Amino acid sequence: MSGRILVGTSSWADPGFVKEWYPPKLPAKERLPWYAQRFELVELNSSFYAVPDRNTVHGWVEATPPEFEFDVKVHRALSRHSAPVDSLPPDLRDMAETSGRGRVRLTPELETALAARLIE
């Protein structure tokens, strides 16, 4: 059997971590690099709620070693969970069809565009 098991958590910004695990008074911008020295990966849980912008993602990559991995959780619309239109990237909102309750209906076109955005 071959393969690799990586160990990490679902966030580097969890309030419990901030309070209990990180060094006291460690600035927020230094938490991800500090985390990446101790774990091999992190789950991007925030991507379930809103697609992060490209500059933010590049900043995360730059703050971590080359071998560090990000496990990206797909946006809730792609996993067929209820999603408000404002959780979509602004340029994709006009293509979104909504239910009577203002929730995104995942059309094939939106699914393709949203999936492409996540892997850019």
Name each region found by the language model.
Residues 1-120:
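Residues lining hydrophobic/aromatic ligand-binding pockets adjacent to catalytic sites
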